[in-house]
């Protein structure tokens, strides 16, 4: 099994965080999230796919990952290119923004892979935050939009034996200031939390219909 992590260029990263974090801060947020993800991957070989040279260099030096320079725009195209350039058939696709994933999640996937053709974990917004394929061409990739349901439909249409891996920690992807709050609650001892704390970011509880907490930043 090999892990593929597709990563967007730094200048397009996490624009919904732009009012809360500068472009430079968003870059280092990403790099710290990648470190947390890599620490969960046990000894699995990892490939990072990106158009961004800085990300590719970081992946080589800091993550000990193989790298692929993305040729065409689009998440599906990037992953398909990785499929073409790697020899392994068993694939685990993980996004770059799920820093709460842990070793035991990966161990679960490895164990489940003995029994299923496809394993999929949804994001909170209906996307796909983890996708295992017994063979890399089992389904047509349908990332973007509500990809979780699209991938399930692909599996059903092809009569694949699949498993829905329903994990809150894996479902948390970081796109908005509110998402950062989950890092403070659930991300103890992560690189991501330590980085956010170094920026003066903190969380206050908020018991109302408007949410569980408020994410703030010290002046």
From Swiss-Prot:
InterPro entries: CofC (IPR002835), Nucleotide-diphossugar_trans (IPR029044). Pathway: Cofactor biosynthesis; coenzyme F420 biosynthesis. It catalyses: (2S)-2-phospholactate + GTP + H(+) = (2S)-lactyl-2-diphospho-5'-guanosine + diphosphate. It comes from the Archaea. GO terms for molecular function: GTP binding; phospholactate guanylyltransferase activity. Keywords: GTP-binding, Nucleotide-binding, Nucleotidyltransferase, Transferase. It holds the Pfam family CofC. One of its GO terms (biological process) is F420-0 metabolic process. Its EC number is 2.7.7.68. Belongs to the CofC family. Guanylyltransferase that catalyzes the activation of (2S)-2-phospholactate (2-PL) as (2S)-lactyl-2-diphospho-5'-guanosine, via the condensation of 2-PL with GTP. It is involved in the biosynthesis of coenzyme F420, a hydride carrier cofactor. Homodimer. This is 2-phospho-L-lactate guanylyltransferase. It comes from Methanocaldococcus vulcanius (strain ATCC 700851 / DSM 12094 / M7). The gene is cofC.
């Amino acid at each position: 099994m090999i892990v593929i992590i597709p990563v967007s260029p730094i200048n397009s990263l996490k624009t919904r965080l732009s009012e809360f974090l500068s472009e430079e801060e968003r870059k280092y947020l990403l790099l710290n999230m990648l470190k947390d993800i890599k620490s969960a991957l046990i000894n699995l070989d990892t490939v990072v796919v990106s158009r961004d040279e800085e990300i590719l260099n970081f992946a080589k030096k800091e993550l000990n990952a193989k790298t692929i320079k993305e040729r065409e725009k689009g998440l599906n195209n990037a992953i398909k290119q990785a499929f073409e350039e790697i020899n392994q058939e068993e694939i685990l696709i993980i996004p770059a923004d799920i820093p709460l994933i842990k070793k035991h999640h990966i161990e679960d996937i490895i164990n489940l892979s003995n029994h299923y053709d496809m394993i999929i974990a949804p994001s909170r917004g209906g996307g796909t935050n983890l996708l295992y394929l017994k063979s890399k061409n089992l389904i047509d990739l349908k990332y973007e939009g509500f990809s979780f349901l699209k991938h399930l439909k692909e599996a059903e249409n092809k009569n694949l034996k699949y498993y829905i891996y329903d994990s809150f920690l894996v479902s948390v992807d970081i796109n908005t200031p509110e998402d950062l709050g989950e890092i403070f609650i659930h991300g103890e001892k992560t690189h991501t939390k330590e980085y956010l704390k170094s920026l003066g970011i903190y969380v206050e509880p908020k018991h109302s219909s408007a949410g569980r907490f408020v994410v703030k930043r010290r002046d």
